[in-house]
Amino acid sequence: MRKGILGKKIGMTQVFDETGRAIPVTVIQAGPCVVIRKKETSTDGYDAVQVGFEPVKERKVNKPLLGYFNKAGVTPFRYIREFRLENSGEYQVGQEIKADVFSPGEKVDVTGISKGKGFAGGIKRHGFHRGPMEHGSKYHRRPGSLAAKGPARVFKGRRLPGHLGAVRVTVQGLEVVRNDPERNLLLIKGSVPGPRHGLLVIKNSVKGG
């Protein structure tokens, strides 16, 4: 059964299992999310639910979006995302989705916007090997040849220096170590994309497990 929740990255810490082994975990404020709209195959062509996360004041929302929230009968939210679910009929508008939607031991996929690193060269951005560093060498960190003389142009997709980070990244197959529905917290093994307080989309893993 497909399911998902929105959250914010709080930071990293460690917990200990029953054998005393330290496990690095990311602490995520997961929800509460509120169902804003249900979509069904009969009316929309597919099954899905739209959820809102992080309530905001009405004055911070534009009029079209405020009308959308008023029609649903819910308070305005900063973030709206849609999850495609085969069981969308089980949800009701206004229903809360909390951190207990995922249980310890479940595998999840976490999507976020990676940290922006600004302009970066080929070594940092793509892992290129550098040139000789000894005295007399005039080739250290440059990318080298870009193309052959024949085409007389650079092909699309060539790895070059440029902007690094600030892109959508999904990390698959992370394990839920612990959940705390009372404080809306999820502890997920390992690291997840993005900075602290960055928005995360958490869904059960497409690879199962």
Swiss-Prot record:
Source taxonomy: Bacteria, Bacillati, Bacillota, Clostridia, Moorellales
Gene Ontology CC: one annotated term: cytosolic large ribosomal subunit
SUPFAM superfamilies assigned: Translation proteins
NCBIfam families hit by this protein: L3_bact
A GO BP entry: translation
Family statement: Belongs to the universal ribosomal protein uL3 family.
InterPro entries: Ribosomal_uL3 (IPR000597), Ribosomal_uL3_bac/org-type (IPR019927), Ribosomal_uL3_CS (IPR019926), Transl_B-barrel_sf (IPR009000)
Function comment: One of the primary rRNA binding proteins, it binds directly near the 3'-end of the 23S rRNA, where it nucleates assembly of the 50S subunit.
PANTHER family: 50S RIBOSOMAL PROTEIN L3, LARGE RIBOSOMAL SUBUNIT PROTEIN UL3C
Protein name, entry field: Large ribosomal subunit protein uL3
One Gene Ontology molecular-function label: rRNA binding
Record's subunit section: Part of the 50S ribosomal subunit. Forms a cluster with proteins L14 and L19.
Species this protein is from: Moorella thermoacetica (strain ATCC 39073 / JCM 9320)
Keyword tags: Ribonucleoprotein, Ribosomal protein, RNA-binding, rRNA-binding
